[in-house]
Amino acid sequence: MALALLAVLSVPAHASAAANSCPKWEPLLKRHFPAKVVPVMSRIMYRESRCTERALSPVRKSTGRPDVGLMQIQGSWATVTRAVCKKQDVVKALLNAQCNVKVAGYLYNNGGLGHWRATSGK
């Protein structure tokens, strides 16, 4: 019982432990992804950031930049982020849910789910 309670307490209030998804952010996902992909993207968001808008990974040695926000967009997408979000400060822009999901939508439209595969960076 203590383990079950610990498991429940370790999941952020805005995340769904049962579905491992981010229902709070699904309306935003629906604006940038086809309806059939929204449940998948919600689960990816949960896996990437546990539904935390301001999630920031350590700086990657390979790029010299962190992965940022709900979808953990790689800092290497700076040019795309500047174009899509019309902001120069890439990290600050990607910490905003609207921008982060908009960039994720752009990536999906230009490569599908491959951007979130475990091997996409190799």
Residue map of PLM features:
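N-terminal export and membrane-targeting signals
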Residues: 1-3
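Catalytic and binding regions of secreted/periplasmic enzymes and modules that target cell-wall glycans
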Residues: 19-20, 28, 39-41, 54, ...
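Export/targeting segments at the very N-terminus of extracytoplasmic proteins
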Residues: 5-52
